[in-house]
Amino acid sequence: MKKAVILVSGGADSATVLAIMREQGYEIHAISFNYGQRNNAELRKVTELVKEYNVKQHKIVNIDLRAFGGSALTDDDIKVPHYHDTKELPEDVPVTYVPARNTIFLSYALGFAEIIGAKDIFIGVHTSDSANYPDCRPEYIKSFEAMANLATNIGGVTIHTPLINMTKDQIIKTGLRLGVDYKNTISCYDPSEDDLSCGTCLACTIRLDAFKKNNVQDPINYILF
């Protein structure tokens, strides 16, 4: 069985990629990050999520990105914006962007992959992300892959982005087809202390809209509903 590494949070995108990897027959090795994020409820969800997909091993890496701040997810002085409708969502880079986060995460994943002899790395970036986050764009992924093959001894590394051309509603549709239980995920940037999603941050707004477009009720609990 071919080994592969996945960058996994406790979100809907990660769950969908896990299901795709399982369908494709990979031996899955997962890596997650406790980087001081405001939404660390995802770490509690991801522990349960990886059990569903018979992940061979799951590493949680501690990194203190709060030392730099610069994002609403890593700096308590920057508030998470809330919205009433998808029409209100920002068109430029939002304050929830964590500078260089995917570069940091992919670098760790690359090291992990080389150590276990895996040449395939999966990440759940997609169309809805690439419009706002510079490190989710196809050209970024292509450039990182080129760097990875220059920087490692193993060579032949492929960065897989199975969701890259999908909108959020297409991702949910794919996951539902593959039997993903989205009840065990959380996407919220600003969850309550008891891990309820706010329902109005950028991530919640996009997620709720995606389920609505699929005529399916989002199975998780929200503060407002």
Curated annotation (Swiss-Prot):
* Superkingdom classification of source: Bacteria
Enzyme Commission (EC) number? 6.3.4.20
What species does this protein belong to?
Rickettsia bellii (strain OSU 85-389)
Task: Cite a single GO BP annotation.
Answer: queuosine biosynthetic process
Protein name per the record: 7-cyano-7-deazaguanine synthase
Q: Per the annotation, how and in what number is the cofactor bound?
A: Binds 1 zinc ion per subunit.
Involved pathway(s):
Purine metabolism; 7-cyano-7-deazaguanine biosynthesis
Q: Does the keyword Nucleotide-binding apply?
A: yes
For molecular function, the Gene Ontology terms on record are: ATP binding; ligase activity, forming carbon-nitrogen bonds; zinc ion binding
According to its UniProt record, which cofactors does this protein need? Zn(2+)
Gene designation per UniProt: queC
Give the matching Pfam families: QueC (PF06508)
Of which family is this protein a member?
Belongs to the QueC family.
Q: Which reaction does it catalyse?
A: 7-carboxy-7-deazaguanine + NH4(+) + ATP = 7-cyano-7-deazaguanine + ADP + phosphate + H2O + H(+)
Alphabetic keyword roster: ATP-binding, Ligase, Metal-binding, Nucleotide-binding, Queuosine biosynthesis, Zinc
Role description: Catalyzes the ATP-dependent conversion of 7-carboxy-7-deazaguanine (CDG) to 7-cyano-7-deazaguanine (preQ(0)).
Q: Which SUPFAM superfamilies match?
A: Adenine nucleotide alpha hydrolases-like
